[in-house]
Design a protein with these regions (language model features):
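Proline-enriched interdomain boundary motifs that mark the N-terminal boundary
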Residues: 86-96, 178-188, 272-280
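Extracellular fibronectin type III
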Residues: 162-175, 255-270, 345-361
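Flexible, surface-exposed loop/linker segments and immediately adjacent secondary-structure boundaries
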Residues: 1-102, 185
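Extracellular low-complexity, O-glycosylation-prone stalks/linkers
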Residues: 116-132, 208-226, 298-314
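Beta-strand-rich modules
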Residues: 149-161, 240-256, 329-345
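Short coil/turn motif common to extracellular beta-sandwich-like domains
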Residues: 99-107, 192-199, 281-289
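Conserved aromatic anchor
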Residues: 106-114, 198-208, 288-296
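Short beta-strand segments within Ig-like beta-sandwich modules, predominantly Fibronectin type-III
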Residues: 132-138, 226-232, 314-320
Length: 366
């Protein structure tokens, strides 16, 4: 073997000589065992790990060597130093790995790993048709691209300081990432809007004949409040419910009926409409006193005008509390008041209903 690695399952035929795997730096001989042999292309070292039975690892000249029992591995380099067997590391924990992936880039987190991990993906459970082989450093995610939608098999093993590979952890998984969902546009995640119809917008997916849309009151989509199928455009307007937090997602459906996975959910909030303000002339007859319901952390923008279109504004202010007291206007007649709230994150609510205020003539100055 001049490069790469091999996994050998040697049965017990009637042979007088052991089966041998030869590399430029080592000879590995076995009878009736399962083991691995790897030739490191950078260092020239040969490593062997024994899973069952026993092997003998020695230099090509057979000047140095060692027997390796099951559960151990050893390495020999070009300097032909005597190899020292090391216990194989236990298999990585893949219990948290999902059984199904719905994005073209398969990502597997290994948050507890402190060793480099070798990861292989194959089309078959015997790993005879390996399509991806990589080493992942401690703390990094496994990222696998280029897989078709299908059932796949993944195995992982830890590497020690010599590069000796430990026991396998194996998991099967299904990739169903296509047709990919359209890109969601609005409402964006974290968006706020006032109570009322919500317009959902997305970019088209040319693979899709139609789009499925879901809106839920929970992130797990167990409480779906609105759903549509067969949408052929790039927008849909829906009434989803009262004030609160909602989540929406979309998915593609191909012409043959093949349904793809949903997009990542986007969270948005419907804020309640402002309550009508109350108030009018103060008891002293010298001021206007106005009040409404509002949150302590919000800024209240207020306006007083002579016309219902608020083109003739006579007073306006930004307040820290949901109340406003101002001097009685000098001119009698009809006035119009409204307010709106500005939240700390910059969200500006709609104007309230307009309060009509009648300011009587002040007879004291006649």
């Amino acid at each position: 073997m001049l490069r790469g690695s091999a996994e050998v399952l040697a049965a017990r035929p009637r042979r007088t000589q052991p089966l041998e795997v030869t590399t430029p730096t080592a000879v590995v001989g076995v009878r009736g065992t399962q083991y691995r042999v790897t030739l490191d292309g950078d260092s020239g070292a040969t490593r062997s790990e024994v899973l069952e039975g026993k092997v003998k690892l020695e230099s090509p000249q057979r000047s140095v060597g060692t027997d390796i029992a099951a559960g151990f591995g050893a390495a020999i380099d070009a300097a032909a130093r005597a190899p020292v067997p090391a216990k194989l590391l236990p298999a990585p924990d893949l219990a948290a790995m999902p059984e199904r992936f719905e994005r073209p880039l398969v990502r597997v987190a290994l948050p507890t790993e402190k060793d480099t991990v070798r990861v292989q993906v194959a089309q078959d459970a015997e790993f005879e048709r390996i399509v991806n082989d990589q080493k992942v450093t401690a703390g990094s995610d496994v990222r696998i691209a280029g897989l078709d939608d299908a059932k796949w098999f993944l195995r992982a093993r830890r590497l020690d300081g010599q590069g000796i590979e430990g026991y396998d952890a194996t998991r099967a998984f299904v990739l169903k990432a296509r047709p990919e969902p359209p890109a969601t546009n609005t409402p964006r995640s974290g968006a706020k809007q006032s109570l009322g119809p919500v317009e959902f917008n997305w970019s088209p997916n040319l693979e899709a004949k139609s789009v499925r849309l879901q809106v839920a009151s929970d992130a797990a989509f167990t409480q779906i409040v609105a759903a549509r199928e067969g949408l052929t455009g790039t927008r849909e307007t829906l009434e989803v419910g009262g004030p609160g937090t909602y989540h929406w997602r979309i998915a593609s459906t191909k012409a043959d009926g093949d349904k793809g996975p949903f997009s990542d959910a986007q969270r948005f909030e419907l804020r309640p409409l402002p309550e009508p303000p109350k108030g009018g002339m103060g008891e002293d007859g010298k001021s206007l006193t106005l009040a409404w319901s509002g949150r302590a952390e919000d800024t209240q923008h207020v306006e007083l005008a002579r016309d219902p279109a608020f083109k003739e504004i006579v007073a306006q202010a930004d307040l820290n509390a949901p109340e406003w007291t101002l001097p009685r206007p000098s001119s009698s007649g009809t006035y119009f008041f409204r307010y709106r709230s500005i939240e700390p994150d910059g969200f500006v609510g709609p104007y309230s209903a307009t309060l009509v205020i009648e300011v009587p003539r002040d007879w004291r100055y006649l």
